[in-house]
């Protein structure tokens, strides 16, 4: 049987095209993930710079000013310094738990960004259970902190890990109940649907006005989940040296440093999505498409405006947790647990009951 050379060349060209399609398909799948990771990294750098500048202003001192223009590259310089430091491991600790703990904390928070809409349907995964996916994933992070504390074989580290687990359990329940109230109000658990439900009524349709009690409980619970003052008991310097971070150095310590700011950013983004209308500007009697002529200029410009509005709301809200760091004193452990179980939990349950009743009456 004789096969023509042209047929062989045609078959080879088809196989090359198929392989190129597979490569391009993989690149196209990874491109949104890479873009999201790059955006999150830049966002964390901006948060660190903002916190240092605001903290310097509150304390009436000069903030970072040498690393880059206005000191904006200070966080990058700190990260480079941590990368170059020696990575020490306790000789008497559990090496596996000690090494895995920081990675679990960072990865679980990173996954939360996959359900955050930064613009009109600009979301990595528009899940029907988006907000509860975030709550489920974020509950894994304290497991990593507990593993880090136990694997360090240090009493201060272990106590810090236990505190992190107890604090997370205490405040995740009120947080979840507030999110459930929002889901009932929006008739959906998708983050995109929640934003669109708020956009129907303009500025006064934000869940900030429709759920004021839930917003306050959500704000306090998210601060506790981020372990920000006055809820930073797992790493209280005066009591536990550095808590579960005591034995860490180098890149592993840097992962905890990144995780804290990632958690702060994701909490602020969810406040924007759940309570502040997301990517909708919602100025009374003025809508973003008519204001900027988005319908005339195409979807790309509208998407960019949506991203800008979302990030602007997020960074404006970030002033609250940064200001509370230098305003409020740290709570005791018994005060923290009492606040979560005796006050926030009953209030969030009452808010859920009121929301359910109002939804039934509106039918």
From Swiss-Prot:
<keyword id="KW-0874">Quinone</keyword>
<protein>
    <recommendedName>
        <fullName>NAD(P)H-quinone oxidoreductase subunit 1, chloroplastic</fullName>
        <ecNumber>7.1.1.-</ecNumber>
    </recommendedName>
</protein>
<keyword id="KW-0472">Membrane</keyword>
<keyword id="KW-0150">Chloroplast</keyword>
<keyword id="KW-0618">Plastoquinone</keyword>
<keyword id="KW-1278">Translocase</keyword>
<dbReference type="GO" id="GO:0016655">
    <property type="term" value="F:oxidoreductase activity, acting on NAD(P)H, quinone or similar compound as acceptor"/>
</dbReference>
<feature type="transmembrane region" description="Helical">
    <location>
        <begin position="300"/>
        <end position="320"/>
    </location>
</feature>
<feature type="transmembrane region" description="Helical">
    <location>
        <begin position="30"/>
        <end position="50"/>
    </location>
</feature>
<keyword id="KW-0520">NAD</keyword>
<feature type="transmembrane region" description="Helical">
    <location>
        <begin position="98"/>
        <end position="118"/>
    </location>
</feature>
<feature type="transmembrane region" description="Helical">
    <location>
        <begin position="127"/>
        <end position="147"/>
    </location>
</feature>
<comment type="function">
    <text>NDH shuttles electrons from NAD(P)H:plastoquinone, via FMN and iron-sulfur (Fe-S) centers, to quinones in the photosynthetic chain and possibly in a chloroplast respiratory chain. The immediate electron acceptor for the enzyme in this species is believed to be plastoquinone. Couples the redox reaction to proton translocation, and thus conserves the redox energy in a proton gradient.</text>
</comment>
<dbReference type="GO" id="GO:0019684">
    <property type="term" value="P:photosynthesis, light reaction"/>
</dbReference>
<dbReference type="InterPro" id="IPR018086">
    <property type="entry name" value="NADH_UbQ_OxRdtase_su1_CS"/>
</dbReference>
<dbReference type="GO" id="GO:0009535">
    <property type="term" value="C:chloroplast thylakoid membrane"/>
</dbReference>
<feature type="transmembrane region" description="Helical">
    <location>
        <begin position="203"/>
        <end position="223"/>
    </location>
</feature>
<feature type="transmembrane region" description="Helical">
    <location>
        <begin position="336"/>
        <end position="356"/>
    </location>
</feature>
<feature type="transmembrane region" description="Helical">
    <location>
        <begin position="248"/>
        <end position="268"/>
    </location>
</feature>
<keyword id="KW-0812">Transmembrane</keyword>
<feature type="transmembrane region" description="Helical">
    <location>
        <begin position="165"/>
        <end position="185"/>
    </location>
</feature>
<dbReference type="GO" id="GO:0048038">
    <property type="term" value="F:quinone binding"/>
</dbReference>
<dbReference type="InterPro" id="IPR001694">
    <property type="entry name" value="NADH_UbQ_OxRdtase_su1/FPO"/>
</dbReference>
<keyword id="KW-0934">Plastid</keyword>
<keyword id="KW-1133">Transmembrane helix</keyword>
<comment type="subunit">
    <text>NDH is composed of at least 16 different subunits, 5 of which are encoded in the nucleus.</text>
</comment>
<keyword id="KW-0521">NADP</keyword>
<dbReference type="GO" id="GO:0009060">
    <property type="term" value="P:aerobic respiration"/>
</dbReference>
<dbReference type="Pfam" id="PF00146">
    <property type="entry name" value="NADHdh"/>
</dbReference>
<keyword id="KW-0793">Thylakoid</keyword>
<comment type="similarity">
    <text>Belongs to the complex I subunit 1 family.</text>
</comment>
<dbReference type="GO" id="GO:0003954">
    <property type="term" value="F:NADH dehydrogenase activity"/>
</dbReference>
